[in-house]
Every structure is written in structure tokens, then in C-alpha cells.
UniProtKB/Swiss-Prot annotation:
One Gene Ontology term of the molecular function aspect: ribonucleoprotein complex binding
InterPro entries: G-protein_beta_WD-40_rep, NLE, WD40/YVTN_repeat-like_dom_sf, WD40_repeat_CS, WD40_repeat_dom_sf, WD40_rpt, WDR12/Ytm1
Location of region: Disordered: 245-274, 412-440
Name of the featured protein: Ribosome biogenesis protein YTM1
Gene3D superfamilies in the cross-refs: YVTN repeat-like/Quinoprotein amine dehydrogenase
Subunit structure as annotated in this protein's UniProt entry: Component of the NOP7 complex, composed of ERB1, NOP7 and YTM1. The complex is held together by ERB1, which interacts with NOP7 via its N-terminal domain and with YTM1 via a high-affinity interaction between the seven-bladed beta-propeller domains of the 2 proteins. The NOP7 complex associates with the 66S pre-ribosome. Interacts (via UBL domain) with MDN1 (via VWFA/MIDAS domain).
Source organism (scientific name): Phaeosphaeria nodorum (strain SN15 / ATCC MYA-4574 / FGSC 10173) (Glume blotch fungus)
Recorded superkingdom: Eukaryota
CDD domains membership: WD40 (cd00200)
Segment forming the signal sequence: none
WD repeat feature ranges: 119-158, 165-203, 210-249, 285-325, 327-366, 372-412, 436-471
Amino acid sequence: MEPEISDTKVTARFTTRDENLHLPDQDRTLLISTNLKRVNLSKILNELLGREDDRIPFDILINGQFLRTTVDEYLTKNGINAETRLEVEYTRALVPPLNVTSFEHDDWVSAVDVLSQTSRAGAWSGGSVQSGQERILSASYDGLVRVWNTSGDVLATSEAPNNGGRITSLKSAKWLSDKKIVAAGMDNTVRVFKYDEDTRTITTSLELFSHRWGVEDVAVHGPSSRILSASSDNTISLFSSNAKENPVAPSSLLPNSTAASNKRQKLSKPDRTVPARGALTTFTGHSSPVSSVIFKPDDATVAYSASHDHTLKTWDLPTAQCVDTRTTGHSLLSLCAIPSRNLIATGTSARHITLIDPRVSATQISVMTLRGHKNGVVSLDTDPSSDHGLVSGSHDGTVQIWDLRNVTTGGQVGEGQQGESVHTIHRQGQSGPGKGHGEGVKVFGVRWDKDVGIVSGGEDKKIQINRALGS
């Protein structure tokens, strides 16, 4: 005997944040069957909007959560009485992003960044970036930074650094403005480069010394000319991109300072012409390598750092004090701020993303846990067009897209709400489900730009751009 199907109806008020998709006033409150699912409600909305011949797939949210079942199942699971009027929001469903193009490198691509009208560096540059003139920055394990156009042409490549024969692999690179680039890596040095669009050159303008081991990450703030670096030596350093504002560099950290073994390099290269400076401040407190560092989006006097010691720390930069420490259960590999929710997203070695409320008043460490990756999550960025979107890059060879409203049940005690990804992007040319959790296709860096799309780089020696059709 088949189970009885409920014919209960419930009152629902439909709203949207898209000004072009508002329903007529008389159609905003409807009596709907609780048997309906998302696809049924999407069809009804298209009919009410007069879009039968040009349908838009809609996602449906009830009380801020995606509807993934029937309305009846949602009401039962959340303990909502059918007599309650539901507040239903409809929004364009996120279309799976398609591969637009890929750019080949000679070595692994460790980091990517985008300069566009809508990027932070574009905004810091006073609107000088024109539509159609977007630039992509890449850092590679060959020790070089490159600037590309969106057609895949290399516009400029930096010269190999004069670093005394140290390992030159880069780990991080950021646009500071349309004319300045900051990059750092395994030779312990943070470099500021001048990018000249007219001559298509990238030249080193400043070298910054503070770390004794490799630099894992850099963060930049254009308006204040400040740079943060996170290092494997367990420290964080603060610099200025203006040479005169920094102190003299420690002589013990300079390459070719006294080493006789580098005599041949000294003879073959001119004396140092690039200014060398030290740090304004060095922050200690982590007990293991610091993997990531960011400025607080609305207050550049505050920074957050993530470490293999399982902690997220909040720093007051003017006083060089750690003002808060949040301890998790796993090594933290990446960071991203979500200002609209007052949360910090942290990628972990345990394959998930933990959303942490860093405010001192917060009583719960993990507000939400996002699961879906099969290896460490090493790069994060937010959706530039939404307060709810997040993108992650992992050593499992995938980039995953998340919507924080996509909440599921279950999970372990203390992990808060659970979320799962809405789309997965594989490396272009990767056949089948993938090579053993990212073998040969690890993703090292990802950026989400409103104009360019989702840009990622990795072990396959490629920059890959994905974008939703029509965006």
C-alpha cells in the first residue's frame, strides 16, 4: 500500500532581492501545496512572471535556508506549523560554472590574483582599470611572477631574483595596486614589484627581510601601503610598501652578506641596487608554521592569522598584541573573511572548512562546518556578487563553490551547522573522477572576481578560468 500523500496547503509570501524579478503585488502571497518541491515552485514563479518561454531556474529559501525537500518535509524537520505563514525568498539558481580557458606555465602555479574594475586592488587604484583590460597575476614554483591578459597572453614576467642561490619557489602574490605587486616564497623574502603596463615589465623595487624560513602567505592593504607576511618560522611580519617607512634590514638575513661560497654570484651580478628593509613589527605567539594571514576587511589595524598549531589568532597591529585566540581541532591552512556574517572561513588539513566567529563575545568556536573536499583546503575566497558565496581550492584537485544558506542536518557536536557544496570544478583535462584525491592536479590558489570569474592555479601548471554562462 502506497503512503498517503498530504494535500495540506500553507500560506507563503514570496520575495526576491532582484529588482527585475519582483512579482506583482497581488501574486506575492499564495496558498501552496506542501507537496511541492523547489522545481515546482520555480515553475509557478516563472508562470507568474510571464516567463514560460524564457524560464529562469530559481532556488527557493524558507526562513533563510535552501529548500531541498518537499515543503511538508521542511516543515516537519523544522517543527513549523502548517498554519504559519512562510517567508519564501526566490533567487536565481547558481548555474554550474563552465571552463572558459586555461593558461600553461612551465612549473606549478602556487598563487593567483586578479586586477579588475571590481577587485580590491582595482578599487584602490582609483578606477584606472578599464573594462576589458583585466589582468591576472600568477606566482610559480619557478620563482617568477607573471601578468596575463584574459586571452592567455603573458604581458610581463619578472626577472629571477638575486637571492644568493636560495630556493626561489613562490608561495603567494597579490596586486597592491595597478602598478604594484607583492610576492613572497621559500627564499624567506617579501618583494615589492613595479608593474609597467606600457613597457610590459615587472621590476623589483623593494626587498623586505624579517623571516628566517619560507614565507607562506602575504596580505596587502593598498590605502595604508601595508603588507603582512606569514612564515614557516612561526611568525608574522608587518611592512610598508614604501621603503623609507621601514627600518634597516637585519644584515644577518641579507643574501650574499658574508658567504664566501657566493663569490661567483657576486662577481657575476652588480652590487645591490634594490632597497633592502626590515619589518615594522614582528608578531610572535604561534607555536607552529603560520599558513595564512589577512587584514580585517573594514579595519586594517586588525589582522587574523591561521597556523598549523590549530589556532586562529586576532592581532591588534598598532600595539602588536594578540587580542584573541580560537583553538580548533585541526591544522589551519587558509583564511578568508566573510564581513556580512562577521565570520572567518578557515580551510583545514582535515578536509573541511570551519566558519569561526572571531568576536570576543562569541561563545561558540565553530559556527558552521562545510564538508565535501577529500584533501586539505589551502585557498579560499568570497563570492563578489553575494553575501553567502564562498569558493575553495584543495589538494584533492577540485575547486568547490559553497552557499552558506545550503544547510544540512547531522554533523558532530561543536561543529555548528553543516553545509555542503553546490558545485564542484575539476581541473580541465582531468579524466574521470580524478587521480587519487588530487595526485598531479592539486589546486594551490583560487580567486573569485566579478568580471573575470573563478581563477585557479595548481600542480597541473595551469591557470584555469571558470565562469557561469551569461555572467
